[in-house]
Amino acid sequence: MTHLTQQTEAELLVQKQLDAYNNKDIKAWLDCYHSDTVQLDFHGFVLASGHDQMRQRISVRFTEPDLKATLLKRMVMGEWVIDHEVIQRNFPEGRGQMEMLCSYQVKQGLIVKALFQAGEVVLF
């Protein structure tokens, strides 16, 4: 088994994507994704497919004033990067947070698939 101490290209790309998310920078965020990327939940339900649907979905999210993702842990295995995050959001019920598992498949320098599993919402 090889232990890497340097960040991989996949890990750097996913961090760039997370930074763009926290900066609410749609262009920088989309630039991390292949134009045909599919975003799914862990049960296989398609959340968005391609840049147009992703832009539409994230544009709404980026209007939330308290939106912020905090990375708790990151694991990398080859082309897969898995993040455990806490997401602070403005839910319809009020301000709160939830844990999120985010799994990103990176090929040729872009995210080609993203899987998400949300935990329970805790309101403040």
Locate the predicted segments by residue.
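Short, well-ordered alpha-helical segments enriched in acidic and aromatic residues
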Residues: N23-T37
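A beta-strand edge to alpha-helix "cap/lid" segment located at domain peripheries
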Residues: T2-L4, E9, D19, L40-D41, ...
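Regular secondary-structure segments
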Residues: V14-N22
